[in-house]
Every structure is written in structure tokens, then in C-alpha cells.
């Protein structure tokens, strides 16, 4: 189990052309951390060669003490952005936070609870298990494709995940650093799941 009082949290925010949301998501992350009394943290932003003004916005907040910002010199994909972040984190637990506001940082306490109360190594925030008051309705073909991909992945890794493609993934950093990630794009999602499952790390969904 992770000691809630002493652990350090790393929040990774890969972004590409998110000028309309990048400051908002950083503000929401900070609000959630303060509300849940997670005071030992770092926010790591990776700008994947944005062309819409995101880079200039990030340069204006480079001096913020709780943020580290890294800039790719060419667009490489989400997987590559996460690989860059992992080389520079210092936290015990890692949250991957998309920059487009689809996933709400107010869920952090729920996502982190298994680390405090069990021996969880990885926690995925599922959009389909319906543990909250309501569940967002998704486009049918995206839902079906995700279900098929998750089902196929479960066969190979002997798990019963409901939402492998979820953007909310939380890891012990020691687990993540024990594997070698090579996928540059959104193929990161199945790659990280399969490689961690093969090492018999303990998965939870919330």
C-alpha cells in the first residue's frame, strides 16, 4: 500500500493543440489536489509540437514551481509524450491526464483510493462499470470498437478489464519504469496494459 501522507504524485499532461483547454485543465488539477490534500505533487506537461498557440501559453507559465514543461521538436504522438514525461518524473504514483477536459480531475481521490487501501499497482478509470451516479453515453461505434479491443486484449493477458482505452490510467511509477515502452501513438494504451499484465502487476478499475 501507498502511504497517503508521504507519497508524491506525478500528473502527466500530454498535449497537442490544446490552447483552449490547457490552462483550464492545469487549474482543475490544482483544485483537485488542494481539495484532497495531495500537497506533494508535480505537474509534468509535454507539448507535442503544437501549432495553435499552446506552446506560447505554456511558456508563460514555465516559472510556476509545481510545473515542469517539455517541448517536442516534432509531433510524435501521445505514447512518445508519455515516454518523455517518464524520463523526468520523481513521483511514487503517476496519473495520465488528458488535456482536453474529457476526464475530470475531481476523480483523483477515487482513482487513488485503491493504492491507499490495497496492494494495487495500476488503476484504470472505467467509463462502463457505472460506479457513480451517472455514466456518460458514448458514440456507438467507438464504444463497440473499444469493447472489441478490450475483449481481445483480455484474452491475451488473462484479465477482465472493461475499458482498456480509458484516458484515465494511474500507475505506481516503479511498475511503469519496469517496462520498456516503444509505441509513439495511441497504441500506447494496449502496449502498456499488455506489458504490465505480463509482469503480473495488480490491476484495479474504478
Give a label for each model feature:
Residues 72-88, 93, 105-186:
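Acceptor/aglycone-binding surface of glycosyltransferases and processive sugar-polymer synthases
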Residues 13, 26, 30, 37-49, ...:
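Short beta-strand/loop segment that forms part of the nucleotide-sugar
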Residues 39-44, 55-88:
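Conserved donor nucleotide-binding strand/loop of the catalytic core
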Residues 47-56, 101:
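A conserved acidic beta->alpha catalytic loop
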Residues 8-10, 42, 191:
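Cell-envelope/extracellular polymer assembly enzymes that use nucleotide-activated donors
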Residues 1-31:
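N-proximal low-complexity "stem/linker" segments adjacent to membrane-targeting elements
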Amino acid at each position: 500500500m501507498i502511504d497517503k501522507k508521504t507519497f508524491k504524485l506525478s500528473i502527466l499532461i500530454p498535449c497537442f493543440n490544446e490552447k483552449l483547454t490547457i490552462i483550464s485543465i492545469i487549474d482543475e488539477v490544482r483544485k483537485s489536489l488542494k481539495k484532497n490534500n495531495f500537497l506533494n505533487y508535480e505537474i509534468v506537461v509535454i507539448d507535442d509540437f503544437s501549432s495553435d498557440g499552446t506552446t506560447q501559453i505554456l511558456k508563460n507559465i514555465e516559472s510556476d514551481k509545481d510545473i515542469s514543461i517539455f517541448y517536442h521538436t516534432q509531433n510524435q504522438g501521445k505514447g512518445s509524450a508519455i515516454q518523455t514525461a517518464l524520463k523526468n518524473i520523481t513521483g511514487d504514483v503517476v496519473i495520465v491526464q488528458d488535456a482536453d477536459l474529457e476526464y475530470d480531475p475531481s476523480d483523483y481521490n477515487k482513482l487513488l483510493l485503491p493504492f491507499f487501501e490495497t496492494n494495487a499497482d495500476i488503476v484504470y478509470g472505467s467509463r462502463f462499470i457505472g460506479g457513480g451516479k451517472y455514466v456518460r453515453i458514448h458514440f456507438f461505434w467507438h464504444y463497440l470498437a473499444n469493447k472489441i479491443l478490450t475483449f481481445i486484449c483480455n484474452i491475451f493477458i488473462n484479465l477482465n478489464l472493461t475499458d482498456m482505452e480509458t484516458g484515465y490510467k494511474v500507475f505506481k511509477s516503479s511498475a511503469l519504469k519496469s517496462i520498456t515502452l516503444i509505441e509513439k501513438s495511441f497504441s500506447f494504451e494496449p502496449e502498456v496494459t499488455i506489458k504490465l499484465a505480463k509482469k503480473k502487476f495488480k490491476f484495479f478499475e474504478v
